Amino acid sequence: MPFEYSPLTAGYIRLITNLSVSSSPSTGDDKIKCTLDEVDLGTGPNYNCLSYTWEEPLYQKYLLIPRIYKDVQYPIECNGQAFSITENLRDALVEIGKSRGGGEDLQRQDKIWIDAVCIDQKNEEEKIIQINMMSQIYANAQNVVVWLGPEMPDDPGCESALRVMEVLSQILPARFKTAVLSHLGNADTYQNLGIDFISKREWVCFGAFILRRWFSRMWVVQETFFAKNFIIYCGSNILPWSQITAASRALKETSLGSLLNEMMEDRDRTIREQSTASQYTSNPIANQFRFHEYKNQVSPLKLERLLADSRYFGAKEAQDRVFAVLNIWKPKWDRADAEEETASFIMKSSIPVEVYERASIVAIRETKDLNFLSLVEDKKWRRLSGLPSWVPDFSAPPVWTPLAGHPRLAKSINRWDAAAGLTFERPAETNSYHLLPVKGLPIDEIVDSAETDLNLIDEHMIYTLLEVLSRYLESANFPGTSTTDRFEAFWKTLIKDTFLGEPAGPKARKAFPMIIVHFFRELDYELDGLRKALENVLNEDETGTQVKRISQLSEIYSQTQVLIGKLSASDDSIIPKWEVIQKAIKMRNDNGVYPEDMHEDVVNIMESFDSAYSCRRLFRTKRGFLGISAQSLDAKDVVWVLAGAAVPVVLREISSTGNWEFVGEAYVHGIMNGEAAVGQELSIFLE
């Protein structure tokens, strides 16, 4: 007899009770039985919640023996009726059912709430009501039982993953930002952190562990935020939540996460697999710490920050990135009438574009400024079509660092205020929200730009940066600035005037030439490798490809060499002389590493450059400003300062409507603190 739900009374939930698992003597299959009771949540019933994934739980790529999940439903008996569940939920119930009656109270699952069973998934009205109650359901639970999926033969007992977490948890916070880390295979990495060595195999097991789907689920954010206690199951193993959070903090606060990315990317390249780097970029276990630390935050959480951090997690439905954080922002059971109206305004639609627009308006109104615009990614990375240009796509990966800062800095230490003196007016919370009214001043038109970060890296097009500098030095449009001033504008712009977290000063100026050395060394290295490979080529097709690439890079080499010679003659403290570059490259090639002081400079200055230039490009304006902004910028785009925005922005006029498209936030040297915020403000609309 198929299962039928009875209607739920308002304020009630269903709980699974009398869970039992028995094995069939003839087939060995597990038979699951349970009952489903209705209880009033307001009476404070004792129960646990299950946190799991509806989809395949494992990251199969690094498993020696992959687990094949079937897209079929499995029968259980509920209230004497047939009920169907997924394979992963069946596995979870089998393990949980077998653990009942254990010696520890935390292992006794007498009553448990599971969304797929306790909510009538075919009743849309009930689903909306129960989803709105979920944060309270998890907050009231005695424990949240996490099912990560089955134990796998590659890592019996999760021993390797557990050892890595145990070792990472021993890193002292004082070493998080101070330890210099080189490579996961180098002993000095672990010595500098004060921990034991971790082998490559252990890192791979740990990588497969953290890429289990549960860690990247968007709804996990809400479930873990409100949980009182955790029981973490990985197969029959119960793992300590404290070690998981400690490891997540270590990955987030050190560069270990980046080194893990590099190691996995190298491994993929070796076995000719599609790169996993994009998966590791968001390091799901490290991201758990973002929301875990919110619990101890004293000041109220802003919707802006929660929406920004939602990018680090996966969601089957794009709108869930907003819906899953609303109760963290303003718990439903604790909302004032006005806050309930605001939440209802956001949830009025389930269409992702509309949900994102509404949430953006609310976030801007809450912060009372326009720094929310710094969360808007370059349009190359946008996944949702139809979004207004000023609305962030929260489903896009967080591949750049917002200039205005995220999380926000305290006003007392915030460095930039490009719109100083301009008055910001909050937009209304209405249904006519496709257009965003703003006020500001147009500053100048873009006339020239360099290549993107990826082309600087992959195609060695650093010469385009030098070309912009050369034309900038030759331009007569901005009298009154010396050659020294223009070189300073150039190098400070490329690192957004920031070095080691501070305003760029003499140390940054000294280190800057290593950017030129680094990029030229990469070009030199590829050319040398191609020429050597040509001596041992295996087929004619390969020969043709290599010859063409060598010709292309040789031309780039010559262009770059000429520009370096020309520019270093004007200021070799910023653009080093050719012989200085060659000497540095020779030391690097001969010793496998730069001398210690040079190595420290290249690591620090490249970190500053990458943070500033990632997903951006250098530009020059008609009146002689240098800046960096979104890589999709184009000639004739206009630099503006907008009331309420801490940094300048680049806008593009839409000729058909007279409105403006938001291109991206910008660092523009010389106008970061109100220098250009003078004159009659214009009122415009962003669309």
Region annotations inferred by a language model:
Residues 96, 100-103, 120-124, 145, ...:
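Amphipathic alpha-helical interaction segments
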Residues 41, 79-83, 98-99, 122-128, ...:
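Conserved, non-catalytic sequence blocks in retroelement Pol enzymes and Pol-derived host proteins
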Residues 77, 81-114:
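Active-site palm subdomain of RNA-directed nucleic acid polymerases
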Residues 74-87, 118, 129-130, 141:
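Active-site neighborhood segments
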Residues 122-152:
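A short alpha/beta connector and helix-capping loop motif
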Residues 111-114, 119-121, 125:
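A conserved hydrophobic secondary-structure block that centers on an alpha-helix together
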Residues 1-36, 41-48, 60-76, 91, ...:
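Acidic/Ser/Thr/Pro-rich low-complexity tail/linker regions in eukaryotic proteins
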Residues 53-55:
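Low-complexity, highly charged intrinsically disordered N-terminal segments
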